[in-house]
Amino acid sequence: MSRQTPSLSFEVFPPNPAVGNDKIITALQDMRELTPHFISVTASNNKFNIKETTVRLADFIQNDLAIPTIAHLPAIYLTKEKVAETLADLDKVGVQKILALRGDIIPDVEPQKDFRYATDLIEFIKEQAPHFDIVGACYPEGHPDSPNQILDIQNLKKKVDAGCSSLVTQLFFDNERFYDFQDKCTLAGIDVPIHAGIMPILNRNQALRLLKTCENIHLPRKFKAILDKYEHDPESLRAAGLAYAVDQIVDLVTQDVAGVHLYTMNNAETAKYIHQATHALFNHQSLG
């Protein structure tokens, strides 16, 4: 039995409102030509107004660009009232797909008490707005706050049982760890599509930030060699980082991944390069 052709999708983030949207609008117009399966729009924890950032950008992508859109909703700093209000705002603009997250903890900022975990948010959405399609986040190398992967996968099963129709992974650089994670999910009875999160490394500063914020991510020897060899050669590091991401994607598609979710960092040129190198592998038909 043949597997369905995998999807290629993109993640973008809303810019700081003080900067304006001109740059991201131009990037998204360029990305539209690549016919992504969907685009997800992130949301900042307790920093910017979700309606003026995430909802507004999701509205533009869904309605002006006619690309299916998923809005991120990190709820640890939101009340039930604010989540209900955000769902209504999204409903008004026709965005009915949510990536439900707990969200990162911000030092010295007290979380709200309504949603301790993503599962709490998923259950609330299913109760308040059952017509929304919910995507969950997952971590092939374990959630940073989880004591072990067994407990992490048990919690992931709770997310799926609560109403997630698919999953998107944290970025990773070691495909073997992703495949091992997939196998463990199958054994745990998790049978929804898992989209692999891929982020091309384009410069040294990006790599250093990533290593600082994602300490749970394993760096294969081949990846470390790229960082070491081209540490002082920005052009070569960018080329090698893109090539590494393409190699990951080709391998993932060969192994029947459900989809690849590209963390674009709002860079249309990155999306274009990846698309040009891999577009024949993907089906760009929207699920609608």
Where are these regions (language model features)?
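Active-site mouth loops of central-metabolism enzymes
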Residues: S7-K23, T69-E81, V135-L151, K229-A243
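Glycine-rich, positively charged N-terminal anion/phosphate-binding segment
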Residues: N21-D30, K47-L65
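Conserved, mostly hydrophobic/aromatic
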Residues: E11, I39, L90, K159, ...
